[in-house]
Amino acid sequence: MCNHHPKHSHGNDTIRIRGARTHNLKNVDLDIPRHKLVVVTGLSGSGKSSLAFDTLYAEGQRRYVESLSAYARQFLQMMDKPDVDLIEGLSPAISIEQKSTSHNPRSTVGTVTEIHDYLRLLYARVGTPYCPEHKLPLSSQTVSQMVDAVLKLPEDTRVMILAPAVRERKGEFVDFFADLQAQGFARVRVDGEVYQLDEVPKLEKNIKHNIDVVIDRVKVKADIKQRLAESFETALRHGNERALAMEMDSGEEHWFSARFACPVCSYSLPELEPRLFSFNNPMGSCPTCDGLGNTNFFDPEKVVAHPELSLASGAIDGWDKRNQFYFQMIQSLARHYGFDVQAAWETLPAKIKKVVLHGSGKEVIDFTYLSERGTTFNRSHAFEGIIPNLERRYRETDSETVREKLREYQNHRACPSCGGARLRKEARYVYVSGEPLHEVSAWPLTKTHRFFETLDLDGNKKQIAEKILKEITERLGFLINVGLDYLNLSRSAETLSGGEAQRIRLASQIGSGLTGVMYVLDEPSIGLHQRDNDRLLATLKRLRDLGNSVIVVEHDEDAIREADFVVDMGPGAGEHGGNVLIADTPENVAKCENSVTGQYLSGKKSIAVPSERTPVNPGRMLVLKGARGNNLKNVTLELPLGLITCITGVSGSGKSTLINDTLAKITARELNRAQEEPAPYDDIRGLEHLDKVINVDQSPIGRTPRSNPATYTGLFTPIRELFASVPLSRERGYNVGRFSFNVKGGRCEACQGDGVIKVEMHFLPDVYVPCEVCHGKRYNRETLEIQYKGKNISQVLDMTVEEACEFFDAVPTVSRKLQTLMDVGLGYIRLGQSATTLSGGEAQRVKLALELSKRDTGRTLYILDEPTTGLHFADIALLLEVIGRLKGKGNSIVIIEHNLDVIKTADWIVDLGPEGGDGGGRIIASGSPEEVAKVKGSYTGKYLKNIL
């Protein structure tokens, strides 16, 4: 072991941990300096998260929550008390984790960061409302302001002052004209024509008319002030508080209103309030879509799932031969319109398709129905149409299951009323400096930031807005500093990746400006290009300089080198980890012999650049043409098959759109027969070289504690078969199901095979206690009496992969799968470990192992999205070996990645960019790493050049 306890003076400047035993920690004693940037690093599974999150954060949070009243505690999640003897020097803790924010469709980047709240305030206080119809500002003027406006016109301009008396009303208005004459007026303007009052033509009764009373005609001179003022006063009296000055030569009109309203149509608003601009408030949300910005509709393309089939054989699910009632309707339609139910849907005329999908309108059709007794009866009525039928069933059903089923046929589209702006009409026509709120929210953050930095308001508006603007620009600045300049405020929070969501939370934390807090972060560099790394580190240092302790679990080399203090966990993973190898400055860690991290930092170990690249075979290319989803600019992607291709580019350059939303979905639809809707593209060629696509992402392998690596990889089935074939099992007649903890029979019924029982404590966190009957073993006594090589099924589930590998080495079906788990570096996880306790990186590697263990044809396309998340240098070397094995069998691998160690070992690179958001979406460079390194304008190339 290297020097691992720099002795600090035990004052207020250290966090002292003594005897930490959470998860796999081996009684760890550790002193961490406070108010410093501390990086915790080590192999995947070495106990970093156990130390940072499950010990430090859990205890900091728990102590803070304990200080609150019992009433307040019930609303907060209480953390379990970590297994530790003593922790001193803790501050209240805030954790910023990888979990993608919310699945609430109402959450946007603006609402999560609270910038939207400040914008609402700004628009309510200094916004200028406009009339949606006439695009004129709503404003009220005094008579003297109206007079001044007319006097500003060039001298000698002939002006007519009018009172708009009737607007868009039907009638003959005979009495009205007589009344005006009696009051001494001489002229009126009717529908744009000026007449003497006694010469007005007879008006048509059923047409809407506009009538203005002519009050005065003047030439603009300085001495007509008094006369103008009197004319305007008269005009306002007769024109419903409105007046109109028309230049007689050019016909140009100047409208005035004495009320806060549109001078033309009197459209007016109550006083502007912040809630008018909230799409989560009925006052502000668009009434059509309730502020969601999109509406669901039944999509004909999804309803007709198999257009190549006939109606009889299942072009439309549920309306074919197997469903007698609905199919009788289709047959009756076919008789009425004379089409063939056996003909493929694609070949039917458009008119017939329209009737089948949308109904026959008013046309009555004779339907013949067959009752259950076998008698037929006839009815005549219009045909409802399949889509209206689905809409009606969706509206009327009370069953969530039916709704779920019907949702499969739905798609979203932008709301027809607000066009996706989410706000009601009144709010969409309030402008600040000529821009409405929903437009500003849709800009990339850099543009929004510039707009508010340079916003120039006049007079008292400037004073009102000053503080609000400071908050808005500061918060936008923080978002830009963590590399999110390409996002916009209206972007839905559920579409953000884990790394983006985490950095947004990081930015809002800096925005809140707390001091004296302990922040615990989980790999904030995920999804960040090398270029943005410096800005992220500057942000973390800024958090530290505010007076906070910043503890980061991180594998990124720059972060480790820039830290004030590094804690290296190890030496191995799982059972073999849980010790602190060294806790010291980065310089000293690099000198430490035992530390794998140190060896990579000092350059003793490194991931080698392959001596030669596999050449591209021009005959085996996958070509995707015209991809234009999100920000892609009509891109053509050429992927050499049978190689490892890295898709690179700064955050927001379009990598996920191109690969996950376009390529993965097209290939899944064409090769795996999946119901996927890819982003728009023109054409794809070269699919004949592939027979399936596998997308290995970081989503959890199961959301319930019952899901575990053994069940997920299919290991558990052969293990249960082994136990069922033991002589004692045969004797008792036990089958495979006896050894499952998910079905009745072999499992312990007291805890239903969970091994723990949840006890609800109202003011405290729910407590999970081991089941008293089976003592956490999940099975009943009879099942546990069956042993294979001296171990029962519960003991097998408790083995680590490594132990199980030795135990089952004589059983090829099991050992093959176990070996692949070993190969991806997961020897330390337990077979029965609950899926919910696996990190994203671990879940992804379990999936990789599952794919590796399958017999494959060598014609598979593997898609991996940032597989290095959660991986240490040494783990990355392992991962690259595994990917190399997949390639060795002839498969094609596409990796979205920022990690330079992976990028430099790829055969082919496709670099998107140059920037994120609108500034991205183009392919800047493609070729071998050496070729890309030479491309000017490619950020990836610039960093590759330094290491190749």
UniProtKB/Swiss-Prot annotation:
Keywords, alphabetical: ATP-binding, Cytoplasm, DNA damage, DNA excision, DNA repair, DNA-binding, Excision nuclease, Metal-binding, Nucleotide-binding, Repeat, SOS response, Zinc, Zinc-finger
PROSITE patterns: ABC_TRANSPORTER_1, ABC_TRANSPORTER_2
Domain of life: Bacteria
Cytoplasm recorded as keyword: yes
Domain (ABC transporter) ranges: 319-596, 616-945
ZnF C4-type span: 262-289, 748-774
Entry-linked Gene3D superfamilies: ABC transporter ATPase domain-like, ABC transporter ATPase like domain, ATP-grasp fold, A domain, P-loop containing nucleotide triphosphate hydrolases
NCBIfam families: PRK00349.1 (NF001503), uvra (TIGR00630)
Name this polypeptide is given: UvrABC system protein A
